[in-house]
C-alpha cells in the first residue's frame, strides 16, 4: 500500500543534516551532486514538499547542526571505520585473462600452423605461442588442427609462426571483440563470413595479401631445414603486424567492457572453484586419428603442461615454444564440445563448427 509519514520542520532539519553529512563523506557537495538532479534543496522540495526557502534554510542550518553534533559525539570503537579502509576501484579486467588491465589495446588473433605429418609437412615447434593470452586449437580439414594465438595487445607478440590461412571457426570467436584477425589466406567459408558481417576492416591476410609489392613487410621467411616445405616457413612479429595495420588504416586501440570468460575478481584475489566436481589431473582430446592433444596437471606449479601426438614420429611429444625452449603450460584449460563436420558439398573437407 501507500506509505505515509508526517515530517515536521525539525525532522526536515535532521534529514537535511544527515543528507549533507552523507554527501560530505562521499566527497560531494549538497548543491553539486549529479545523482540528485540539480541540487539538494530542489531535490528536497520535490520529495519532501517543502519550499525552496525552507529547504535552503534547512540545508544550511542542518549542516551546521550536523557538524556540531558530529564533533560533539564520536562513534563507539566497534562502529568506527578500519584505519586501512579503502574504496574498491572499478573493475577493469583484461578481457582475455581476467587480470587487471593496463591499457586499451585491440585484441589480435594470429593463425598458426600445426601440421606434423612428415619431415616435409612439419610446422613444429612453433614460435611465439607461449606468449599468447589465449591459445585456441580446432580441427580444420584433412584431420589436421590449427592454432589461433590470441593476444590482448600487439606489443605482447614476439616472433610468431609459422602463420597459416584463416578459418571461420576461429574468426567467429574473435568477431564479438572486434579483434584484428591476422593470417595468410583463408577458406571460401571464412571469406563469406567476412563479407556477410562486413569484417574486412579488421581482417589482414586475404588471398594474395602477403609477400606482394603492396604489402612487402608484413611477414618474413625462415628456412628451417632443407626438408620443410616452403608453406611452413612464414613468420611475423609485432613490428610487422603494426606495419600491416597502419597500411590498412586499422587502429590498434579499442576499449572493451566485459571479459571472454567469467573470471574471478582480481581485486579481491578470489579463486573460482567448481565444488563437487572431480579433479582434472589429466585431459586428453582426440581431434582425429593423427591429431591428439593432452594436458597433465603439475601440482607443484599448479598448471597444465601440454603435449601433442606427432604423426611424424608416431608418439606424443612435449609442445615446445621454439623461442623459449620450454614446454607450454596453462593455468586454465577449457574444452568446448560442439558439432563439427565438413561443409556440405565441399571437396576440401573444410570443417564447419556449430557453436
Please annotate each region the language model reported.
Residues 29-36:
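Bacterial lipoprotein signal-peptidase II cleavage site
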Residues 27, 40-41, 45-52, 249, ...:
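Short, flexible coil/linker elements and helix-boundary hinge sites characteristic
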Residues 75-134, 141-355:
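A surface/extracellular/periplasmic glyco- and lipid-processing/surface-interacting theme
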Residues 4, 11, 38-46, 53, ...:
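Polar/charged alpha-helical tracts
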Residues 1-11, 15-26:
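N-terminal secretory signal peptides
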Residues 37-77:
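Post-signal peptide N-terminal segment of mature Sec-exported envelope proteins
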